[in-house]
């Protein structure tokens, strides 16, 4: 019987394959590292301008709560304007004042936004515990606003979470969005949807 033997690849071919494989792995690692290193933190003020709003989604999704006191023709949008601090600051906290509420449960937290009428009671915004942190990479924003809190009717609602958005380095115009589940109070189980836009000031 004829004996068959397996034929091995020439040593030079094997070495070439190993070199190519190692080079590709190195390039992939370098690319990932470069991408991560290009993310730059934006520490400063995200000014709140026209076009910023809050919406509230019913449990289960698909339907938005109508705020009869909204200044917009579409009552599912509650328009928000800058407060005394100009907007949302990263790297520092913007706590609610003491006391945090006035008569009838109206919020006195007016640094981030001017308290807005929601269902007959003014709500304000504050940041507590963890300062907001937002970075930009390739014109895309990412980060967190874990300490973002809505103050309304003598209650504080955590509305923090991861954020996404866009940023133009030439005009400094940004768009920032996120959503957060509401726990407790009369709107327990609803989801708050936030949309901020304006300019960033370092």
Where are the regions that the model predicts?
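Secretory targeting and sorting signals
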Residues: 2-36
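Alpha-helical protein-protein interaction elements
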Residues: 16-18, 38, 45, 93, ...
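N-terminal segment immediately downstream of the Sec signal-peptide cleavage site
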Residues: 35-88, 180-202
């Amino acid at each position: 019987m004829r004996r068959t033997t397996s034929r091995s690849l020439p040593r030079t071919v094997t070495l070439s394959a190993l070199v190519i494989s190692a080079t590709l792995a190195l390039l992939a690692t370098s690319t990932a590292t470069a991408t991560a290193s290009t993310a730059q933190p934006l520490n400063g003020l995200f000014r709140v301008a026209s076009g910023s709003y809050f919406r509230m989604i019913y449990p289960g999704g698909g339907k938005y709560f109508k705020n009869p006191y909204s200044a917009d023709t579409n009552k599912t949008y509650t328009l928000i304007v800058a407060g005394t601090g100009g907007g949302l600051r990263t790297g520092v906290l913007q706590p609610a004042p003491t006391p945090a509420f006035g008569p009838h449960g109206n919020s006195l937290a007016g640094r981030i936004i001017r308290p807005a009428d929601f269902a007959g009671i003014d709500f304000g915004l504050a940041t507590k515990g963890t300062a907001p942190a937002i970075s930009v990479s390739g014109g895309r924003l990412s980060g967190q606003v874990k300490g973002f809190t809505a103050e309304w009717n003598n209650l504080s609602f955590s509305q923090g979470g991861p954020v996404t958005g866009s940023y133009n380095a030439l005009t400094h115009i940004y768009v920032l969005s996120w959503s957060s589940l509401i726990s407790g109070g009369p709107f327990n189980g609803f989801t708050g949807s936030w949309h901020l836009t304006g300019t960033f000031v370092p």
